[in-house]
């Protein structure tokens, strides 16, 4: 299976890893980035926290037919030999299933990069699907430390912070900017102010 899933918490370096992997890959390749607001086929950019960026083509999570059409165009009409997808957690499970099917049918590797957990501690549907179907050697977990002050534990949760405290309820997909921290379980489940 030529499919990988690179997953970690917010700020763990997934986009940095995608850019690194993309730049050292000698094959013809294309980078795609999943968006909640931009149209499929529009130009996008994958940015890492270290300031580096990579041009990409946007996939809108709600435009299933256009996303499949785009992938088919990439596979059938270009010389693309590898596909990199950033923010894959935003894709619906059905889109990931179709992408996996196309990848296997036409032997074009796809590398997914995305979060596994929502801020409520539940798996994203697409991430759950990838974690279920892929063998462990095709899953790369990228870890990072807890962002709570003076904590040296490994973070396990993406915490949405509201009024300085962890919020564990609300809509998963919000278009306005929210504030998130990567926290260990002790700080995630502690109801005291984090910041």
UniProtKB/Swiss-Prot annotation:
Keywords for this protein: ATP-binding, Cytoplasm, DNA synthesis, Kinase, Metal-binding, Nucleotide-binding, Plasmid, Transferase, Zinc
SUPFAM superfamilies reported in the protein's UniProt record: P-loop containing nucleoside triphosphate hydrolases
A molecular function (GO) term: thymidine kinase activity
Location in the cell: Cytoplasm
Record-annotated active site: 87 (proton acceptor)
Residues reported in the UniProt entry to bind ATP: 8-15, 86-89
Keyword Transcription: no
InterPro entries per the UniProt record, alphabetical: P-loop_NTPase, Thymidine_kinase
The enzyme's E.C. designation: 2.7.1.21
Annotated Gene Ontology cellular component terms: cytosol
GO BP, sorted A to Z: DNA biosynthetic process; thymidine metabolic process
Residues binding Zn(2+), per UniProt: 146, 151, 184, 187
Protein name: Thymidine kinase
Organism: Bacillus subtilis subsp. natto
Lineage: Bacteria, Bacillati, Bacillota, Bacilli, Bacillales
Gene behind the chain: tdk
